UniProtKB/Swiss-Prot annotation:
Pfam families: Chalcone (PF02431). GO terms for biological process: flavonoid biosynthetic process. PANTHER family: CHALCONE--FLAVANONE ISOMERASE 1-RELATED, CHALCONE--FLAVONONE ISOMERASE 1-RELATED. Part of the biosynthetic pathway for all classes of flavonoids, a large class of secondary plant metabolites, many of which are brightly colored. The gene is CHI. It is an enzyme of class 5 (isomerase). Its EC number is 5.5.1.6. This is Chalcone--flavanone isomerase. Substrate binds at T50, N115, S188. The record marks Y108 as: Important for catalytic activity.
Amino acid sequence: MATPWSLTAVEVDNVVFPPAVKPPSSADTFFLGGAGVRGLQIEDKFVKFTAIGIYLHDDALPFLAAKWNGKSDHELTESVEFFRDIVTGPFEKFMQVTMILPLTGQQYSEKVSENCVAIWKSLGIYTDAEAKAIDKFVSVFKDETFPPGSSILFTVSPKGSLGITFSKDGSTTTVIENKLLSEAVLESMIGKHGVSPAAKQSLASRLSGLFKAGGDTDK
């Protein structure tokens, strides 16, 4: 499989996502799978709220390529199953959400929580355990404010935990042990109704290129 280290950085509305990072709660370096803006069409203007970068552990490449190598960027972008495989795959993921506009922790966590609950209810898997995980998720953000340029950092473990860190000095990592929550936070970004179509397109394009490069290298 081709190495991802030849990948370039991605700039999203003056936020630069480097090609590789070491997440705060992992010992390994992850590669930038893709990045994009999250915004809303408000009347005749597209208002950008956050820039989202999605990093994947090296283990993601052989896992995803086994099924998706040979597919075009467009085919991957349109495939709900492809993004489900990224969300549920047995490898670590790291997401950096950087503010373009200021947000309060309450504004951010309530919107993410709504999206997570909607995903679970659509799948018929919303239980008391998930409700408790959502309560803890909201409480982590309760007293936070995020000025432009500040970031929320999520680390998703395949074992079922979600690490949450804030970019400000002295921030510690809070870990929530709930597999469905860890997956739903990422799914809310890049799933069927994900808030960042641009990040989905970026992931599809960059991963498609890596799959092709891996195929060529192996011949």
